[in-house]
Structure formats: structure tokens, C-alpha cells
Amino acid sequence: VESFYRYNLTENDKVVYQAHEWMTGLGALYVQLAVPEIGTIFTTHATSIGRSIAGNDKPLYDYLFAYNGDQMAQELNMQSKHSIEKQTAHHVDCFTTVSEITNNECKELLDKAADVVLMNGFEDDFVPQGTAFTGKRKRARSLMLNVANKLLGTNMGDDTLIIGTSGRYEFKNKGIDVFLESLNRLNRDKDLQKNVLAFVNVPGWVGEPRE
């Protein structure tokens, strides 16, 4: 970012560095220090320590008022992530989050309210309308069934019920545990008359690059 700005742009160009989540925090802090001409925005979709609190079966929102972010980071061995996120939130030009409930989380756990709340969601026209939607849906179903049948050696037809879940690998926070238990109950339902194809679109390995 710094090199591109120095060698490809001029002082008259307006540039904003948008950082999402704690993983990009160091980049935002570096740009803030090395290229102050670039505006910096940091957006958190949920605090790292908040995710950890919830993921460890602790009640996050019921007792949010009682949590101290720094203390909980130490207890849950989250000091590095929490520190990067907190310092980034406090030092960028503009700190944002995606909902009022997450903003409450930021106030309590990062000791910093968002400068702006940018509500999460999609525009109404995100989903195609009419025949365009029907065509896309039909092609998508056909592709998913084709892949599943080839992988599993099955012959599931077009009346198959397709369900799915996706997101980062947070087993409890993202409801993956609930999704799998629902499939388990469906699998034992003697009244179920059709095939059910379930997709779990979650990264399976994010620790390091694969060889």
C-alpha cells in the first residue's frame, strides 16, 4: 500500500485504507504511522475476545456489563489478538462496526465505541427477480447435486432437499453444532420421505499454508 501510494499516486489523490477484523489491524497501524496521508478505517464484525467468550460457553451479552476485555483476554489466552484489535480501534482515523449490539460489545471490551455503525446486510435488489432467479436457482441446484452424486456415488434426484451452512470455523458461535444435531435428528426421522443433501461450507484448515 505504501509503495503503491508513493509511486503511483499524487498528493491530490484521496486514498482510504479499509481494514476488517483484528488480522488486518497491524496493516492499518503501519499505514497510519508511515503514510498518514492515507485515511484509515478499521471495521470489526465482532470483537475477538467476544467471540472467545461465547465460544467458551460463557454468557456474552447477559453479563457484558461485567466483563473487562483485558482481563478476559488474559484468562482466555487471547492477549495478542485482543491487543492488536484494541490498539487499532483506538488509533485509526475511523473505527466502525456492523450493528448496535456489536457496538455495545466494543464499548465494554475494547473501551471504545465505534465512530460510525455501518449496518450489516444486503440491498433489496441483491437477489435476482423473476425468471432470472428461477434460472440461477435451477443451475445452482443441478451443479450441487452433480458434485454430491459424483463424490458420494449416489443418484439423488431433483426432489432432494438441499440445505447448508457457512462461515468461519466457530463450532458453537456459528451454530455448526446445532446444524449437525439437526441433521442427526433428521437422519433418525422415520417419516422423512426424501433425500436431504447438506453442505457445510466452512474452511477446514486455517492454521498455516498447506504444503
Residue ranges and their predicted role:
Residues 1-211:
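Catalytic cores of nucleotide-sugar-dependent glycosyltransferases that transfer UDP/GDP/TDP-activated
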